[in-house]
Amino acid sequence: MKLRVFLACVSFLVPFVSSSATTLRVEPYTIPAADLGPENPLPMFRGDKEDDVPKLDPAIPEAERRYLGWRTAWRCLPHRMQDGYSRDKKPRTFDSLVLENECLRATFLPQFGGRLMSLIQKPSGRELLSRNPVFQPANLALRNAWFCGGIEWNTTLRGHHFLTCSPVFAAEVRGTEGEPVLRLYEWDRVRCFPWQIDFHLPPGSPFLFARMRIVNPHARELPMYWWTTIAVPERKDVRTLAPATTALSFNRDTGVSLVPLPIWNGRDQTYTTQSLSAYDFFSRFADGQRRWIAALDGEGRGLFEASTDRLRGRKLWGWGMGQGGRRWQEFLSLPSEAYIEIQAGLAQTQSESIPMPARATWCWTEAFGALEADPKLVHGKDWSSAWKATDEAIERILPRARVEQLDAKFAAVTTRAPARSLKLGSGWAALERRRCAAQGLPDPIPAELPFPRESLGADQKPWLALLEKNELPKHNPGEEPGALMTQPEWQSLLEKAKSNHWLTWWHLGNLRMEALDFDGAEKAWQASLKCQPTGWTLRNLAVLAERRGDKAKACDLMRQAWQAGPQVAPLAVECLQALTRAERYAEAYDFVAALPKAVRAHERVELLWAKAAIETGKLDGVERVFKREFATIREGEVSLTDLWFAFQEKRLAAIEKVPVDDKLRERVRHDFPPPRLIDFRMYVTGGK
């Protein structure tokens, strides 16, 4: 039996004629999982700039500088932040979609952005990915919540995707030979375009293929972004290879540098365990070079990813071997589950978007599978021989021409309507189709991407009423104000609406603020207050005041917002943040003391209270903060270790009756290293 399966898997290069061996089914998937919790009801407005241009090494050629930083500045709206999770895990069952043939078993979770959780090579029983044994959100994504493991699909904007912890649509499509193909798809709410991924696992294929399609439905250019993020196990003997001799590497202090491969800073950076700090590098390919990346162990075995030429970028990411990097690894999973990321993207780096022409459609195909190459060459000192041996091994099992042929063949499936629906995503695409139909506009979404009426839910209900009745329903300000909107077409609908109540003006102000029309936002929010004073509107005015540089006014408005209510934890956190930025520490300390017990227990309230306590010299009770495991520490955030050092400085200064000066600070950092529990410093090594 094993011999028959092996022969079926190795004979894939011969065109297949039967579809009987590929199956697609829904299966329960049970793992220890934290509750994702409620979304944050407060809108998080983007900054004033659309570009985020890093420092650039003068050695980087002009052609590679052109789009670095272009349209990469953070934004989240109309999505709300997903920051309500904890670290309490219990067994939970999710619906998974399993695509399987004789050679591979691929398991997807449509509830979490369509994440490919597992890819098992059946003849050997090997898991080809880093499969996270738990679901533990952490603060790394554009909307905060993110979890590690498997393969993630990221579009729209630099960072982990808006839907990485949200449902997407899933459907079964018939393949070129009648075999089942899994389609994942959604509507992007930030830049307003549809995207889809068709997963092909032909009978006898030892490779999983993903054919992506992005459609720009607009008569204008779109900044476009795509990166496929693949987690693979990290071990000392694992080497990441790509066909390049130089790379671009990002550093928080020096920006983007052009570096040699594989050795720089005295270490071979293709082995992630040789680096103490977190790092990445983006390979620079020669013209005409096939695009691929692989992570191979000491025996020359591992996973590779290859694609058609549109997907031009490849990246390696490692957490580093410092205490903070190791802490992050176990924080995201379990102590024994260290991983690295190999990635593939549309641009050369992740710090850039690229212009997508009006009305354009972009497609490409990626392949994922097991690879074996000569370990002596793969791990030899000659880097050129190492990557060329890997390149040749990939070409033997999956020729570049074959992938191009399959991409052309799969194109017919890309535009094919599904045979059956498997899972529903959000109702926003269905709402957009209704808006376009009501306004006599062309459908911006290909017909073969169904977004049925039943996907419309509570989030879309008030906006549907605005569209159909020219009126946004009234809403109790004691409850959360509901889903947000930033699409310009809805701004004009709100401006013409019959409804004249606080929520209509509040939403209109949100739209204007996100469009950087600060005066227009203020007018709308003042109109909202005239209709009915609410904490939601006062908070937004506080955000605007701080944006304009008036910290005192921002603090006062935040306090008014808290008094007006509803007194929810996210508002308390923002009020404390405003007081802290204004250095009104005594006021912040007293504010916490008056909070309801449930709000006082919020981890961010606790963290800000500790800051205020240290600054005001009230050190009693602060030490308990350093024994708490915080759930929402941000990637790159060092607030906990900063608090630790500040606490030790104040404590020693009081005991020894000395000032807190540079000499004391240096001593504290040498004599009082932070506990592992709170050390998330990714760029600190050797205690420095």
Which stretches of residues belong to each language-model region?
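A contiguous, surface-exposed recognition patch within enzymatic or periplasmic domains that forms
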Residues: 27-69, 97-100, 107, 111, ...
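Extended, loop-rich substrate-binding clefts of extracytoplasmic carbohydrate-active enzymes
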Residues: 59-102, 148-207, 323-351
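Short Pro-Gly-centered flexible turn/kink motifs
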Residues: 97-102, 106-108, 171-173, 212, ...
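Alpha-solenoid helical repeat scaffolds
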Residues: 503-507, 536-540, 570-575, 603-609, ...
